Amino acid sequence: MCSIMGYLGTSISMEEFKKHFDETISRGPDMQKIVEIESGGIIGFERLSIMGLTKEGMQPFELNNNLLVCNGEIYCFRPIRERLSETYHFMSTSDCEILLPLYE
């Protein structure tokens, strides 16, 4: 199971966030990514790879100032991905990446 941690606000530093986030690394030991949100906040994702381990498939995914993290597996995502690929350029082969263009 992956680890997801988020914080909205400006009263803690990136270093403090990372210190606490590192305590959950056993839940997502394969890769880690932390993103600072311009409006004030931090979101982190530690990955437990199920469908491959590429840097392009690393979350949070970003599209038009929207961030997405997903701790799940989307079954039957390929037909949806094919339909969306007519208007959206996918950066990875991750099943979860379909959620951002679906949201928009």
Where are these regions (language model features)?
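N-terminus-centric sequence/structural signature that marks the extreme N-terminus
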Residues: 1-104
